Curated annotation (Swiss-Prot):
InterPro entries named among the record's database cross-references: Ribosomal_bL9, Ribosomal_bL9/RNase_H1_N, Ribosomal_bL9_bac/chp, Ribosomal_bL9_C, Ribosomal_bL9_C_sf, Ribosomal_bL9_N, Ribosomal_bL9_N_sf
HAMAP family registered for this protein in UniProt: Ribosomal_bL9 (MF_00503)
Cross-referenced PANTHER family: 50S RIBOSOMAL PROTEIN L9
Source organism of the structure: Campylobacter hominis (strain ATCC BAA-381 / DSM 21671 / CCUG 45161 / LMG 19568 / NCTC 13146 / CH001A)
Name the UniProt record assigns to this protein: Large ribosomal subunit protein bL9
Gene: rplI
Pfam families tied to this protein: Ribosomal_L9_C (PF03948), Ribosomal_L9_N (PF01281)
Family statement drawn from the similarity comment of this UniProt entry: Belongs to the bacterial ribosomal protein bL9 family.
Record key words, sorted: Ribonucleoprotein, Ribosomal protein, RNA-binding, rRNA-binding
Function (record text): Binds to the 23S rRNA.
Amino acid sequence: MKILLIKDVKSLGKAGEVKEVKDGYANNFLIAKGFAKAATTEVLRRYESQKQKEAEDERYEIESLKTLSNTLKGVRVKIAKQVGSNNALFGSVTKDDVANALKEQKNIEIDKKLIELPQTKTIGIYDVNLKLKFGVTAKFEIEVVGE
């Protein structure tokens, strides 16, 4: 019996593969436990169209991330912090500060988990990296100024 694996099966193969197995194994275990579906032409056609849609969605998301990366090139965001002697900050600039400044000043919303922030203990200009999905990265600058 031909089956389409829905989930990875250790001794058989990975999700998305079509395999030939014995009827009993397919019906009593793989299909019953939700690891596979019978590989009818309709099931295979639906699976292929779903894969194409997912690939198209992924391409669209990569394009939008690249556009965001290009938008952030050359951007500088100002962040005001309290300053003590020797231009040292009270505390440091956090990922929240950077995300909020980007939203307020440039109207760009970024998840703070994506921000890679260097240690900021004094006023000055710092490079900030964003690690987006699919290996796309972005760089921009923050300028830390005293209040």
